[in-house]
């Protein structure tokens, strides 16, 4: 089923006619919808208050806290969609991988996965493993009403990079050594991770997600040839696994200007674009039949109001001929961003694009 169809035999949900979902389906919209990656996070004082003293992973497993954090930017900024508060390594933790999220570092894996014997530690994910996700989605969908809720997961390549490297990496040397040195083990690893990721997304969709985004944070480290050969099959498996639900599927990675066409080819309905490629050029690279999401440089929000509006206007102008456009930043909200600048940005985009 394509993103242009409501689920078979079911009436459209309360969110179906929202500007966000219409844009994802490449339908006419009353205004360009806006949401921000990492909109629920450290840029908000109310987030810092409720998270105080609570480790990141623990906060992702408390349904009422997750719901409150997810709702905060919707209340404050008036964004067109909420995005579920979690972390891409949550499903790995849920299946028993010994990991922690260290402040200022990111996910750290106690025992990296680098051999075939290590693969046995990656068991299947079940809904029972992440019951707190289902509970949080229930709380959120009741509270959000007609506002769409975006679910998300980490893409197989990025999860593999964390598992193989043992944490964040600048050069991904262990990851690439495995990918080039033992292609079969690499393929089996990504296939296993694709199954885990698909299961995690299915839990979110069945609990009420209106759309899902697959984050491939590190895949910009690869050439197009390496992506096509070593990553595309696993990402495609994820998208195919959730294709029957009728919810839009978004794909985003940082530094993926040379991979945009392949991100769409993997099965996305919407391709996220970082700030390095103008949206009109991105549309040429992606090809027809896809909506685009993006792509204001997050650092622009540290400039004055006039500069922000000028750069935003450039993004909107580049999006004029797109089949569908969801306004977003070209990456996540930076932690020290002034939240008032985000609120003004939402208002500006809405005002400038009202049909």
UniProtKB/Swiss-Prot annotation:
Q: Which CDD domains match?
A: URO-D
Q: Give one Pfam family.
A: URO-D
The Gene Ontology biological process terms listed for this entry are: heme biosynthetic process; protoporphyrinogen IX biosynthetic process
Q: Is NAD found in the keyword set?
A: no
Per UniProt, where does substrate bind? 38-42, 87, 162, 217, 331
List the molecular function annotations (GO) for this entry: uroporphyrinogen decarboxylase activity
One cellular-component annotation, GO: cytosol
- In this chain, the site described as Transition state stabilizer is at 87
Q: Which residues form the signal peptide?
A: none
Q: Does the keyword Cytoplasm apply?
A: yes
Catalyzed reaction equations: uroporphyrinogen III + 4 H(+) = coproporphyrinogen III + 4 CO2
User: HAMAP family, per this entry?
Assistant: URO_D (MF_00218)
Tell me how this protein assembles: Homodimer.
Q: Which family does it belong to?
A: Belongs to the uroporphyrinogen decarboxylase family.
This chain's protein is named Uroporphyrinogen decarboxylase
Which species expresses this protein natively? Streptomyces coelicolor (strain ATCC BAA-471 / A3(2) / M145)
Name of the encoding gene: hemE
């Amino acid at each position: 089923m394509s993103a242009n169809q409501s689920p078979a035999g079911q009436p459209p949900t309360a969110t179906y006619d929202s500007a966000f979902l219409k844009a994802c389906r490449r339908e006419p919209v009353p205004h360009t919808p806006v949401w921000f990656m990492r909109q629920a996070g450290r840029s908000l004082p109310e987030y810092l208050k409720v998270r105080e003293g609570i480790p990141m992973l623990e906060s992702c497993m408390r349904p009422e806290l997750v719901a409150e954090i997810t709702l905060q930017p919707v209340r404050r900024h008036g964004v067109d969609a909420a995005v579920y508060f979690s972390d891409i390594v949550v499903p790995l933790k849920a299946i028993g991988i010994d990991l922690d999220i260290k402040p200022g570092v990111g996910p750290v894996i106690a025992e990296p996965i680098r051999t075939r014997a290590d693969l046995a530690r990656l068991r299947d994910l079940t809904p029972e493993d992440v019951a707190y996700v289902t509970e949080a989605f229930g709380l959120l969908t009741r509270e959000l009403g007609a506002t769409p809720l975006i679910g998300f997961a980490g893409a197989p390549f990025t999860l593999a990079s964390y598992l193989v490297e043992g944490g964040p990496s600048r050069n991904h040397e262990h990851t690439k050594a495995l990918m080039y040195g033992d292609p079969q083990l690499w393929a089996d690893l990504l296939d296993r991770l694709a199954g885990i990721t698909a299961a995690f997304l299915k839990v979110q969709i069945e609990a009420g997600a209106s759309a899902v985004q697959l984050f491939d944070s590190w895949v910009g480290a690869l050439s197009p040839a390496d992506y096509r050969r070593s990553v595309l099959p696993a990402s495609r498996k994820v998208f195919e696994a959730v294709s029957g639900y009728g919810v839009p599927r978004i794909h985003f990675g940082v530094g993926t200007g040379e991979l945009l066409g392949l991100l769409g080819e993997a099965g996305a309905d919407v391709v996220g674009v970082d700030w390095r490629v103008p949206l009109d050029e991105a549309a040429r690279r992606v090809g027809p039949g896809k909506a685009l999401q993006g792509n204001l440089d997050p650092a622009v929000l540290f400039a004055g109001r006039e500069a922000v509006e000028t750069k935003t206007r450039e993004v909107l102008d580049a999006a004029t001929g797109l089949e569908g456009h969801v306004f977003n930043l070209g990456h996540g909200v930076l932690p020290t961003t002034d939240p008032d600048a985000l609120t003004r940005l939402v208002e500006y985009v809405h005002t400038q694009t009202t049909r």
